[in-house]
């Protein structure tokens, strides 16, 4: 199934992916959710990895660079809180 989105909608999705990348990176680095328990941190990372996996697989991307998203997916998959 092909998703038909406007250029603006695609840009919004890409921006949201960047937010997930930033959050995964920050949780792993210990600069986000430092006061939360391990289960909450793990849940956050897992949810954001799942979001990135779903979004990277979309067929509406054209020239967007997925390097950071793929790196965050890999880092998040290896993360254990």
Predicted stretch roles:
Residues 2-81:
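Beta-rich interaction/scaffold domains
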């Amino acid at each position: 199934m092909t998703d038909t989105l406007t250029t603006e909608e695609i840009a919004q999705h890409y921006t949201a992916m960047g937010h997930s990348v930033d959050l995964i990176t920050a949780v792993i680095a210990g600069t986000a959710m430092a006061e939360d328990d391990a289960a909450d941190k793990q849940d956050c990372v897992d949810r954001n990895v799942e979001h990135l996996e779903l979004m990277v697989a979309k067929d509406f991307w054209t020239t967007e660079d997925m390097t950071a998203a793929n790196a965050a997916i890999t880092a998040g998959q290896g993360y254990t809180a």
